[in-house]
């Protein structure tokens, strides 16, 4: 356990790995070697760092499977972010939670559509009744006795003194 957390041991293993890679690949023109070495270095460092963390986590918690799964998912997501990917690895629990949230949202939207559809049907029925009430029906004789503006109409002959009482007369005012 002490060797795993020792920085000198880690650096010597990294140096050994780089020397081994240099001896295997002797082509000096290989352009991707620094990238491969960097990825392998990061993987080795994560491996060295994750072993003590896993041992402590397993001893401290009772649910070892979930802790290991969470650690592995976190490590993979970190590697994906380092590589420049925007995608992430999710566990089945997270997928189920997201699916439950999506199903709830779809149910809420379906209920809203149902309410709106019911309201629209009611509005169409109301508009139909209003339209039916506004349709003009041809009538042969119109009874004008019930019209308010047709009561008590006097003609020019029926007015007193033959003058229209509603026409203005000339008024002079003193100044």
UniProtKB/Swiss-Prot annotation:
Q: Which UniProt keywords apply?
A: Activation of host autophagy by virus, Calcium, Enterotoxin, Glycoprotein, Host endoplasmic reticulum, Host membrane, Host-virus interaction, Ion channel, Ion transport, Membrane, Metal-binding, Secreted, Signal-anchor, Toxin, Transmembrane, Transmembrane helix, Transport, Viral ion channel, Virulence
Topology Cytoplasmic: residue spans = 52-175
Which residues are reported to be glycosylated?
8, 18
Spell out where the chain crosses the membrane. Answer: 29-51
**InterPro entries linked to this entry:** Rotavirus_NSP4
Give a GO cellular-component term.
Answer: host cell rough endoplasmic reticulum membrane
Give GO terms: molecular function aspect only.
Answer: channel activity; metal ion binding; toxin activity
Q: Does the keyword Transferase apply?
A: no
UniProt binding sites for Ca(2+): 120, 123
Could you give a single Gene Ontology term from the biological process aspect? viral process
Protein role:
Plays an essential role in the virus replication cycle by acting as a viroporin. Creates a pore in the host endoplasmic reticulum and as a consequence releases Ca(2+) in the cytoplasm of infected cell. In turn, high levels of cytoplasmic calcium trigger membrane trafficking and transport of viral ER-associated proteins to viroplasms, sites of viral genome replication and immature particle assembly.
What is the similarity comment for this entry?
Answer: Belongs to the rotavirus NSP4 family.
Q: What is known of its domains?
A: Binds 1 calcium ion per tetramer.
Q: Indicate what this protein is called per its UniProt record.
A: Non-structural glycoprotein 4
> Per the UniProt entry, what species is this protein from, by scientific name?
Rotavirus A (strain RVA/Human/Australia/RV-4/1977/G1P1A[8])
């Amino acid at each position: 356990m002490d060797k795993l957390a020792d920085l000198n041991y880690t650096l010597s293993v990294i140096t050994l790995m780089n020397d081994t890679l240099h001896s295997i690949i002797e082509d000096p023109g290989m352009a991707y070697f620094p990238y491969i070495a960097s990825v392998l270095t990061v993987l080795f460092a994560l491996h060295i760092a994750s072993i003590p963390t896993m041992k402590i986590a397993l001893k401290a918690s009772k649910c070892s499977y979930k802790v290991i799964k969470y650690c592995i998912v976190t490590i993979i997501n970190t590697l994906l972010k380092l590589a420049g990917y925007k995608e992430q690895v999710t566990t089945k629990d997270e997928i189920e939670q997201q699916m439950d949230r999506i199903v709830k949202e779809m149910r809420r939207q379906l209920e809203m559509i149902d309410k709106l559809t019911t309201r629209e049907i009611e509005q169409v029925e109301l508009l139909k009744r209003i339209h039916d009430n506004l349709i003009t029906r041809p009538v042969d004789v119109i009874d004008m006795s019930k019209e308010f503006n047709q009561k008590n109409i006097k003609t020019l002959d029926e007015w007193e003194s033959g003058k229209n009482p509603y026409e203005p007369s000339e008024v002079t005012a003193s100044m």
